[in-house]
């Protein structure tokens, strides 16, 4: 993107943001890329590049052999816990606290909790969280002991539920599982109330989450996409700001403050 094109992108985004009072921010893995967390879809460095998703992210795989999955998710939780919110996360939190808007809501596909750690208070997790755990059988919550492996390990036995003896599992949504109904309903409601949607760092190919921006489009909500590359959602966006979250969102805040 040329310098002039970048200026135009900022001007357009700022113009839309100035007129909006209720903001819906829809984020994916690219949101956390500048925090050092690899995206799932990156062909060269993606977290899935050397791992079969069906082997580490399906309920069937968990039922067959939970130890490799427990080891992997505990390691991932440690990686996420050591990461820091980037400038993009901080910018959204700043926006929420500014007097230019009434409300900023985040619907995220991420499971790293970096939005909350940056200070955002209204975050809906479509795919759960690395830091929430429950019994596989009775759903009793398990308090995280934060004893995370420092390096990936092949196998680790999940702890057992004190109530029923079932295995403790990560509180994330796997292939073969439904998205949480309450979170989905909240996301739909916030989109219904929004007068601007910002899409950040998502490929738009993970369903049903990818259908949410289409709801905004159907309502006539202006959509700004922030992504280094064009995605499946670019066609429904009013325009795509070809940049990263850590670059574009602070630039947007500076534009609003000018």
Swiss-Prot record:
It is an enzyme of class 2 (transferase). Residues 3-258 form the Deacetylase sirtuin-type domain. Its cofactor is Zn(2+). Zn(2+) binds at residues 135, 138, 161, 164. The active site is at 127 (proton acceptor). Binds 1 zinc ion per subunit. Its main location: cytoplasm. It is found in: Cytoplasm. One of its GO terms (molecular function) is histone deacetylase activity, NAD-dependent. InterPro entries: DHS-like_NAD/FAD-binding_dom, NAD-dep_sirtuin_deacylases, Sirtuin, Sirtuin_cat_small_dom_sf, Sirtuin_class_III, Ssirtuin_cat_dom. GO terms for cellular component: cytoplasm. Keywords: Cytoplasm, Metal-binding, NAD, Transferase, Zinc. Its EC number is 2.3.1.286. Substrate binds at residues 73, 76. Belongs to the sirtuin family. Class III subfamily. NAD-dependent lysine deacetylase and desuccinylase that specifically removes acetyl and succinyl groups on target proteins. Modulates the activities of several proteins which are inactive in their acylated form. 2 residues (Tyr-73 and Arg-76) present in a large hydrophobic pocket are probably involved in substrate specificity. They are important for desuccinylation activity, but dispensable for deacetylation activity. This is NAD-dependent protein deacylase. It comes from Corynebacterium glutamicum (strain ATCC 13032 / DSM 20300 / JCM 1318 / BCRC 11384 / CCUG 27702 / LMG 3730 / NBRC 12168 / NCIMB 10025 / NRRL B-2784 / 534). The lineage of its organism: Bacteria, Bacillati, Actinomycetota, Actinomycetes, Mycobacteriales. The gene is cobB.
């Amino acid at each position: 993107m040329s310098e002039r094109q970048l200026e135009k992108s900022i001007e357009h985004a700022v113009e839309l943001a100035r007129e909006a009072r209720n903001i819906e921010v829809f984020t994916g893995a690219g949101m956390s890329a500048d925090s050092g967390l690899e995206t799932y879809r990156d062909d060269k460095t993606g977290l899935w590049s050397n791992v079969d998703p069906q082997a580490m992210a399906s309920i069937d795989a968990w039922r067959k052999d939970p130890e490799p999955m427990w080891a992997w998710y505990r390691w991932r939780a440690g990686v996420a816990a050591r990461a820091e919110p980037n400038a993009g996360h901080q910018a959204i939190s700043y926006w929420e606290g500014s007097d230019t808007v009434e409300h900023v809501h985040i619907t995220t596909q991420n499971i790293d909790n970096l939005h909350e750690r940056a200070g955002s208070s209204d975050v809906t997790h479509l795919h759960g969280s690395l830091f929430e755990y429950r019994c596989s059988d009775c759903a009793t919550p398990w308090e995280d002991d934060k004893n995370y492996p420092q390096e990936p390990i092949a196998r680790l036995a999940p702890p057992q539920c004190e109530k029923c003896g079932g295995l403790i599992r990560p509180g994330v949504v796997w292939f073969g599982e439904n998205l949480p109904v309450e979170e989905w309903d909240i996301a739909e409601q916030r989109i219904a109330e929004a007068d601007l949607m910002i899409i950040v760092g998502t490929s738009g190919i993970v369903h049903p989450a990818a259908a949410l921006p289409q709801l905004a489009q159907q309502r006539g909500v202006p959509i700004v996409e922030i992504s280094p590359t064009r995605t499946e959602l670019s066609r429904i966006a009013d325009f795509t700001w070809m940049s990263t979250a850590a670059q574009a969102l602070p630039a947007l805040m500076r534009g609003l403050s000018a």
